[in-house]
Amino acid sequence: RLLWRTLIGHSWPAEGIRRLLAIPRSIHELIWGLLLLQVIGLQPVIAVIAIAIPYGALVARVVSDLLDSLNERNLQALVAAGTAPPAALLSAMGPPLLPGLISYGGYRLECALRSATLLGVFGLGGLGNELLLTLQSLQFHELWSGLWLLLAVMLSLEAVVGALRRRWGMPGRFSLRAAGVGRRGRELVLAGLLLLPLVFGVGRALAIEPAALLHWQALPPIAPGGWQEALALPWPSLVFNTVLLTLLAAALAVGVAPLLLLLVAPWPWGQRLLQLIWAIGRLWPPPLTALLLLFVLKPGVITAALALGFHNLGILGRLLLEGSEAAGAQRQEALRCSGTGPRLALLYGRFSGLARSYLAYGAYRADVILRETVVVGLVAGTGLGTQLNQSLSAFAFDQLLLLLVAYAALTLLGEDLSDRARQRLLQQ
């Protein structure tokens, strides 16, 4: 909204684009991969496009929300002084936007790593294909070797992103000399230029051919009477169970992260242990966690909610830790020096200032959990995800189309509710 209001004086194009991008956002990358598989065939480019479509829409929404949450006074001052709107936007909003953009970009890159593993079965190869083969052959020792390798890659990625965030997003507290003007900008441009040949080289090594997107295959015809069968599905029950699964998983993920940090506050090693557990939660995709839970639990909404909640708990826990580190320890140390216990000092010294932004991000995370109900549909035994998997297996494209429309409608409704909740939290 801020971008369009500054450039043309109206924000209505932002609302239209936001609603339009809700359609690709509402469909999980796994479903995009299966749909593209029917249209294009088995090609490595399928996995790349299947990840890029929903992730591009998600990044657009998050960047828009970050821009709208920033203070506009510097921008208004530059525009009032006669600066061109594009230059004013870049100068006033670029520096405060950079830390959040780096943090979210690293998180989204980590998500893409997991999605590439999940979509490796579409011809991309790599760990995804190897993990699928080990599961099919019941070679679980090889499965764990692959997962530990993926964990090492993910932790290395976190370390690199953390170093970049500290270098580009935070001031140097002990630096005796101020950084040169435009240093961060020059380093960002240089990093982008260095990444371009790397991206092309990796794409060439994986035999990714964009020309394959031009050769489409015809979808099978819809059987007579298919629409009547699709409309006869138990839609109220499917929607209710999907919403219930989303709410349970979101409550588990949002509520447990700060409670665990408060619980281990007196012990320095406790936070390290939590970081390891949360890293495993981010590493394991929800379907794998759900399969492990089936050894001790029955298929149902609770099992699927635990799988989704554990995965998203790892994500929210990491972001809460990053926010705590960025907030500084001055208030917490002042409370400790006055005799306050470690848990209360952490609660009032750090978490109180992060509560609104954390809950606002939790509202956004609930939208993502709604998308992820697709991948645990078989474990839930009910809901739109289960029915969508059954329709895909039966090639019932009439049912599939209606189910995707239902997911898009739920996503639009969820985004509207989460936007209202987030704006109310951030404005208080």
PLM features: residue spans?
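Membrane-cytosol interface at the C-terminal ends of specific transmembrane alpha-helices
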Residues: 42-108, 115, 159, 299-350, ...
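Transmembrane alpha-helix boundary and packing residues in multipass membrane permease domains
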Residues: 34, 38, 47, 104, ...
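N-terminal, non-cleaved signal-anchor transmembrane helix
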Residues: 1-12, 157-269, 273-275, 419, ...
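Loop-to-transmembrane-helix entry motif
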Residues: 20, 24-30, 34, 60, ...
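Generic hydrophobic transmembrane alpha-helix motif, especially the helices
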Residues: 17-55, 275-309
